[in-house]
Amino acid sequence: MTDIAQLLGKDADNLLQHRCMTIPSDQLYLPGHDYVDRVMIDNNRPPAVLRNMQTLYNTGRLAGTGYLSILPVDQGVEHSAGASFAANPLYFDPKNIVELAIEAGCNCVASTYGVLASVSRRYAHRIPFLVKLNHNETLSYPNTYDQTLYASVEQAFNMGAVAVGATIYFGSEESRRQIEEISAAFERAHELGMVTVLWAYLRNSAFKKDGVDYHVSADLTGQANHLAATIGADIVKQKMAENNGGYKAINYGYTDDRVYSKLTSENPIDLVRYQLANCYMGRAGLINSGGAAGGETDLSDAVRTAVINKRAGGMGLILGRKAFKKSMADGVKLINAVQDVYLDSKITIA
């Protein structure tokens, strides 16, 4: 097992010993082997959705824990294939993307329609597929930071996918159209029995104020999570909160002083717990993103993110660039270290 405390370094006590005095854990719907029977059984999803959610939970190294380790590789569209795969050209071949997820013991591999369709007959029965339906691409100039549908729900279903995903840029000029598109797509996905995952990202230049990037503030990302759950996301993917007070800084929208005085603190675990509270207290699962590849600190950064997510009550990590920009062996090692956090019974809910 990974030496988690050593990787956390000076943050070990602050993260591993923290007691949450904001939102009590007994008010949350926490991950567990019985999550589908205990939590999802209340909702209106068809039985096939529950079956496919259980399929996700029963796959990989985290099988039976209620936690998820997902490999996302859609950056070939979002960030360009060259920028994404030049470090490891083998990942230009979709086969190796799926092999990385299998070798690392992930619950699921998430990628574009094209990537997964090109190898679906060989792999769809070996590891659950999550097809990302929409993307932003950086070939159009100037970049409008919009999300365009690249595939239909039916295309994902026909290749054997158990889940679909999409991004909405909440706060952007295009967000209301995106909300309508993805709400309809998620409705259709549920009709076909697929799990729905929303990348609930913020996007507006006004969210950067006085040198602080409030795209990762707990209050604003929390509201994005609430909107994601509103349109039927079974799982919400969100960037880990790094600050708070976005509403106050941009002086727009509605908030309450108790969000900052009672429901959050400066501890990152409490900030992520507020993100989870906005996922209907965990009725929609919260997975945090692993972030960009940063070099020597990737392993410690990924483990830190996993510890915060788990102790806050989150459902897991969706980590891509930190893994696939390394050799396959090192990528597997990094993903396994993250999984070790969720397998470690000594790392408890705060």
Swiss-Prot record:
Domain of life where this protein originates: Bacteria
Keyword Lipoprotein appears in the UniProt entry: no
UniProt GO BP: glycolytic process
Activity regulation note: Activated by citrate.
Protein name (database record): Fructose-bisphosphate aldolase class 1
Subunit structure: Homooctamer or homodecamer.
SUPFAM superfamilies, alphabetized: Aldolase
Organism: Escherichia coli (strain K12)
EC number: 4.1.2.13
Family classification: Belongs to the DeoC/FbaB aldolase family. FbaB subfamily.
Mutagenesis / variant outcome for changing residue 237 to A: Loss of activity
Gene behind this protein: fbaB
